[in-house]
Amino acid sequence: MNIPNLDQNVILIDSVSKRYNLCGARVGCIISHNKEVMAAAMKFAQARLCPPVLGQMASIGALDTPDEYFEEVKAEYIKRRDFMIEGLNKMEGVFTPLPMGAFYTIAELPVDDTENFARWMLETFRIDNETTMVTPAASFYKTPGMGKNHARIAYVLEVDEMKKALHILEEGLKAYPGRTI
């Protein structure tokens, strides 16, 4: 926040849902030295009543979380990330870079359209009556056409479950009618 000559261009956004693994808790903050940004943010904030009480109460409790918790969570997510990235990059035609600060990756898949592939996986493909889900990444891009064959894949499952999900994904990619390789 104190970068010389850039203080008017820096916005810090944080949330308890990300910092404390409180998925769905809509409690967070926005900080900036830019008065126009803060005035616009306040207009939105004042138009809303408040986050749900349960999320507020959980957030208060989360503030007392010991540092050791974060070290354990970080180590676990690094393990999950490395497992996921290695597994994806071993699949024919799949590429994903190593994320450095998220719990998901954006993977390039050998498919004609990830929206169609994701729907096909959910509606048609099964192994032992199970499937896996990917999130089409096109909506994360502003440029039209970007991300059409990319998927956002979270590594929030434990490694044993991810292993199964990766196997299902790999077999689904092999069987998908819109495969491009």
Residue ranges and their predicted role:
Residues 1-181:
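PLP-dependent class I/II
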